[in-house]
């Protein structure tokens, strides 16, 4: 299960 923290952390890597 992905958490909001994981999502935001991954998004930052792609931003």
Curated annotation (Swiss-Prot):
UniProt keywords, alphabetically: Cell wall, Secreted
Organism from which the protein derives: Solanum lycopersicum (Tomato)
Places the protein is found: Secreted, Cell wall
Highest taxon, organism lineage: Eukaryota
GO cellular component: extracellular region
Lineage: Eukaryota, Viridiplantae, Streptophyta, Embryophyta, Tracheophyta
Main location: secreted
Name the UniProt record assigns to this protein: 22 kDa cell wall protein
């Amino acid at each position: 299960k992905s958490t909001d923290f994981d999502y935001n952390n991954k998004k930052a890597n792609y931003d």
